[in-house]
From Swiss-Prot:
Source organism of this protein record: Prochlorococcus marinus (strain AS9601)
Superkingdom of the source species: Bacteria
UniProt-recorded name of the protein: Photosystem I assembly protein Ycf4
Pfam families, per database record: Ycf4
Record-linked InterPro entries: PSI_Ycf4_assembly
GO cellular component: photosystem I; plasma membrane-derived thylakoid membrane
Alphabetic keyword roster: Membrane, Photosynthesis, Thylakoid, Transmembrane, Transmembrane helix
Family membership: Belongs to the Ycf4 family.
Membrane topology: Multi-pass membrane protein
Amino acid sequence: MNSDLTSFDKIEQKIGGSRKISNYIIGGMLTIGGIGFLLASISSYTGRDLLPLGNPSTLLFIPQGIIMGAYGVIANLLNFYLWYLVYINFGSGSNYFDKSSKSVEIKRKGLFKDVEVKLNFDEIKSVKLDISEGFNPRRRIALVLKGRKKPLPLSGAGELKPLLQVEEEGARLAKFLDVNLEGLK
């Protein structure tokens, strides 16, 4: 969540989506692996080597060739899905806070349509810092809304910022919205 303070009564934060280095690396590996398994399967069926490495034409089509073909199909299906998410930049968006109109706009790119949430300042109970360490650490800022059990996350999924930066952004947002800050221990 990049805080771009445009003026004293407005805050706009840009949220990154699925266009991350890790998704490009995993997508590339899935592409190469999926095509490789499919070519190995086709090589075992036709008896011709379609891969420059190894000798897949000597593999028996049943069961090795069929299994490699299934792995190739599964890898390519996952591959197309991941590249589609990267193409649409799934999860990207913005948070817009306007003090003069006392409104909050949260926009995110969804899988098939965009999600847009509009709130008034009086619907916000507090700003919550959701911090958990361990194997799968999480450091995110969320809005606790009146009449809703689950907080509304503001930070992007998979963002792991330094703890001090998350605390400062949460405190700045709570002060801007004139609400309490939860989650500090």
